[in-house]
Structures are given as structure tokens and as C-alpha cells.
């Protein structure tokens, strides 16, 4: 027997009361985005489950993709069949025969939500357990902690059989907590910050600053690859490339070296906030970790934050670098992040950046710039690209590798 579908159990959505169906519909849409590389698949949701019908698609890559989607508490590959006792008996016998090995223990766990069905849960447990013993007389039944728990659900539309329960990513469906702008440099920290923001349901749009010719096309591709990795957790992400060369050259030519980083970050914050307002975002997200580098002392954060009243979310602010690296490795962004391409934060980095910059000094140095004009030109020059999941590209690359 081949699996018919993947049954997805919802996570925190069960606590959302009147908004529950809005959350479930958003999860359904996110699942459809993530599974877009599998064109035969169809997705249907109800209040308790989301059903991913395989329609002949190999279930394993689908499970691997679904495991990463935020809002999924657990999932099970299932066999779907008509609500017929003879069909159930045959299916249970076939499944247990395929799983059997010496010493295997099992139990049947039936749940009947269709109370019009001819047998109740207790009767089904007894009948189906007996059917297993008919074909496997040496198998052992065990009610506590068996090797296999064969779950049978009798629902209004069909019967479902499963024996695996795979842990999902948990969290909230991406997009149910509003929209935020993720400042993504290409380093280790900001993709992890984006991942954690996605987990709490934030729909992120990535803002990346590019300063050609000082930053290379490789640096831009790296940032887009990191964004593509993040699409696995909730679907497509808008990638916003910001032209930043003019501003960085102005700062380099007109500001004291010790304040280069502070002024650069203040301009980045202004521009990100202007893009947020233009695109109806609610917050800014970044990868700052307290005390990690010169621009991430409290004094620096205060001087940089002063350009906006928009809330700034810093998901990794209290994490050690090793903790951030471990999470980056777990979400598969680390190897991309350490590719040796310079970003806007490193190309003009001073040898001795100011670790306790004074807000008054920063504002005094900025009097040398046409702030509004520089910000306006940067915002008007943005390039927006929709980044989609990478599964199709990976499959094509694997096919090419196999042919070669």
C-alpha cells in the first residue's frame, strides 16, 4: 500500500478562539507555497487537520518540507480508504504484515468521530486486533509503549490509518503576526533572527544593502540564497535590494573614522524604516547580539535607534555567538553565511570603531549630509525580487549531476 496523504496537526492554533480559521487558512496557504515544487499535491484544511493529498507523489520529500513549516505541530503519513469494515481489516493486516519482525509489539488505537459508523471504537479495536492475530499469530499485543501504535480514525468523509507521528516545527503560521522588515547583511546572525521571527508568525521582507563595486554580485547572491533558505519555514519572501554606494562614499569622505559604523547603521535604519512605511510593515528585525561587536553595545544601539520610533525586534540579542552558530547550523544557513564575500558593514569598517558613540556627536556629523535626499534616492532605487523555495532547483541540479 502507498500512502494517500500527509495528515498535519495544528500547533498553537487550537488556542486562537475566534481567529482560529484565519490562522488555519494562513497555514494552508503557507503549506501550498512551500509545496509548490510538487504540482500533483493538493491541500485541504478543516478545524482539526490539514490534509495534504499526495496523488502519487513520493511522500518522503513532502514530509521533509512539511517538518519545517511553522504552525505544524505534528504530521503523519496516512492511508485513506472508504469507511468499510472489510477494507479496514485488509488494510490493517497488510500494514502490520509489512512491519512485522520477531518480538514486535503493537496495539490498535481507534478514534471514531463519525458516530453513525456501524462499530464503536472499542469494537473496532477488538475486531482489527483480532484480524492482525489471524495473519500474525506470534505477534504480541501491548497496551503501554508498544513498538507500533496503529491509529485508525473514522471521520465523516473517510477512514484514515497511520502509525508514524513526526514532530513539526511548532510556532505560528508565518503572516499571522503582521509584517516586519528583516535587515539581512549576509552574516551568521541575521538569518537566525529571521528564522526566530518567522517562528512567531511574523511575515518578513528582507532588506539587503548593496554597495557595488565595493560589494560583489557574489555577496548579493549570498544574501538571496540565505533568504531562499528561510522560505522553507513559511513560503515566499520578498527580497529588497537597496543601493547604498552613494551613502557609504559620502560617509567615508565626510565623517570621522570612529563614527563611520554608527552613521552607516543610522542611515540603514532610516532607509529600512522608510521602506517599512512604504510597504506597510509594523516592525524592524535585525540580528544584533548585545556586546558582540562595536555597533552592538547599548550606547551604540541607543545612538542608532534614535532615528526611528518604530519597534526594533532583536531575536538573538541575549544569545552567545556559539548559540547563534549552533542554530544557524540547525537551520542550514551557516555554510552560506561563512562564504567570504564582504558586505556593507565590513567594506569601510574602521580599525577602532566608537563603542560608546554620543548621540549629539552623531547628529552633529550628520549635518554635513543631505539626509533626506540620500534616503529618498536609496528608497527610490530599491529592487524587489520574490524568493521562492529551492526544492525544484535542487532536483534539477541533482538530475544534472546524475547525468554528468
Curated annotation (Swiss-Prot):
One of its GO terms (cellular component) is cytosol. CDD domains: PPase_ThiI, THUMP_ThiI. Residues 60-165 form the THUMP domain. It is an enzyme of class 2 (transferase). It comes from the Bacteria. HAMAP family: ThiI. This is Probable tRNA sulfurtransferase. It comes from Streptococcus pyogenes serotype M5 (strain Manfredo). The lineage of its organism: Bacteria, Bacillati, Bacillota, Bacilli, Lactobacillales. The gene is thiI.
